[in-house]
A protein has these predicted regions:
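N-terminal alpha-helical "arm" segments
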Residues: 1-43
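Long, hydrophobic alpha/beta structural blocks
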Residues: 40-217
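Short amphipathic beta-strand/extended segments with alternating polar/hydrophobic composition
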Residues: 113-117, 256-262
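Eukaryotic intrinsically disordered and solvent-exposed regulatory patches
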Residues: 214, 233-235, 263
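Short coil-to-beta-strand transition motifs
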Residues: 216-228, 273
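OB-fold (S1/OB) nucleic-acid-binding surfaces
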Residues: 230-258
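Short nucleic-acid-contacting surface segments enriched for D/E, G, S/T with interspersed K/R
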Residues: 262-277
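Short, Lys/Arg- and Gly-enriched loop/turn segments at beta-strand edges
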Residues: 280-288
Length: 288
């Protein structure tokens, strides 16, 4: 987790005792603003949120003991005011050994389930009976790179959008048990694999693959992404004065925010270019 708080401007905090001192200070100075929620098992959970710039902050969380002692369990970064990424079906589960919640999003645009760290767990605890209407996705990156865009004509862009929409519809039909849809998807995948195998012999992979969203490593909420840069904001951590970039990325037709320390991004980010990096994926749920 220490690798990812550098993405919000804490790159000098590399040792556990340094991070502990930072968390102690934030908890001590902001204890009056602590939010407390009670779970259905009568467990009292708390969190303290410290805004560090216009868009990012650090959340410290834990549980209350019987005598009112605040026991800290962990911390995570967050991004505020991100846009809706998906309105697909989403489920939330609590981890067995701590008060961390994860979400699973079934979005057919990706053709797989996305697992993310829930960024607003107390909202969920206070409103468990309310339906989840949408999810705002955002991630944190400690090492990113800017890629040039793939040159496309307007016809190619429209054709790509249509193929993506058709594939989404086929996946929806396949989930309902449509045999024709399953056969079509299988044939398309085989054809795509054959085409890529031929092209990869003479072309760079990032000149073939426009955007990418796939699991990375052993953690289930870490993803490797390649996406188009739609917007860029530069901000400053008020505690460390480190520069932070907040990128709005479109990846496989899904929009999400990505925070990265400015010095950790190789290349000059501009709208229209692409971003490549491994992100720790978080999500804020919106409820009806």
């Amino acid at each position: 987790m220490q690798n990812y708080i550098r993405s919000i401007g804490f790159s000098m905090y590399k040792k556990k005792n340094e991070v502990k001192e930072l968390l102690d200070k934030i908890q001590r100075e902001n204890i009056a603003s602590a939010r407390i929620s009670v779970t259905t098992e009568k467990e009292r959970l708390w969190e303290i949120r410290k805004n560090l710039s216009e868009s990012v902050g650090l959340c410290i969380y834990g549980y209350l003991e019987n005598l009112g002692v605040f026991v800290r369990e962990g911390y995570f970064p967050y991004i505020k005011d991100t846009s809706v990424s998906s309105v697909s079906k989403c489920s939330i589960e609590k981890h067995i050994d701590d008060s961390v919640f994860s979400g699973m999003l079934d979005d057919n645009r990706l053709g797989m389930s996305l697992i993310f760290r829930l960024s607003n767990p107390l909202d969920y605890i206070d409103n468990t009976s309310r339906k989840i209407s949408s999810v705002n996705l955002f991630g944190f990156c400690s090492d990113g790179r800017v890629l040039l865009p793939i040159k496309k004509t307007l016809v190619e862009i429209e054709s790509s959008k249509q193929r993506s929409q058709d594939r989404t519809l086929l996946i929806e039909a396949a989930k309902r048990g449509d045999e024709n849809a399953i056969d079509t998807l299988t044939t398309d995948e085989a054809l795509l694999y054959s085409t890529l195998s031929d092209r990869i012999q003479t072309e760079d992979v990032y000149s073939i693959v426009d955007t990418l969203f796939m699991p990375y490593g052993m953690e289930n909420d870490i993803y490797s992404i390649v996406g188009n840069i739609l917007d860029i904001k530069e901000e400053e951590n008020i505690l460390t004065n480190e520069k932070i970039l907040i990128l709005k990325i479109e990846c496989s037709d899904i929009e999400l925010g990505v925070a990265i320390k400015k010095e950790d991004l190789q290349g000059e980010p501009t709208v229209g270019r692409r971003f490549k990096g491994n992100i720790w994926l978080h999500g804020k749920i919106n409820q009806e």
